[in-house]
Amino acid sequence: YGQVLEGYDFTGLIKEMKHTPVPEDVIYVPSVEELEALDIMKDLQNKGYGGLPVQIGYCNGHNKKLNAVEYHRNSEINVAVTDLVLLIGHQQDIEPDHTYDTSKIEAFLVPAGTGIEVYATTLHYAPCHVNEGGFQCVVVLPKGTNTDLTFQTEKMGEDSLMTAKNKWLIAHEDAKIAGAFN
């Protein structure tokens, strides 16, 4: 599914994240200027993505459920600011009709301060909180990921799962996620 990252100093990033909101639901912000201005940006871009332009954002809030899974064409780097649980699975387990059996999901505790690489073929979505104060998670992806599509997709095959740039999403029908494949 991924690996724990070594050789990064996330101290400044974690400190800056203390200024981000932790709502009662979940918020995702793909790119945050204050996070991208930190020294760690160069390390993440060069060591983590081989020099590709990246964005640093966050996913924060309170969550106790799996209502969707997504994947990208590249790894995602997460830094747990608080303890959190990731619910993850394998892209290869998506059925030909683009459904996914959630009984195959596994839960992993990511301790606060830990940086991880979530491989491109790993299904994931918003973390679950461990403590009543909610969760805070840094999200690093290639620049433009999870932003609005600027082109039309044919809503057939795998393209029917694309809801944003570099984002393929399968949602539970009760989640009512706009544009998602249910």
Q: Model regions: which residues?
A:
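Active-site region of the double-stranded beta-helix
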Residues: 1-112, 126-182
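Histidine-centered metal-chelating micro-motifs
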Residues: 114-116, 121-125
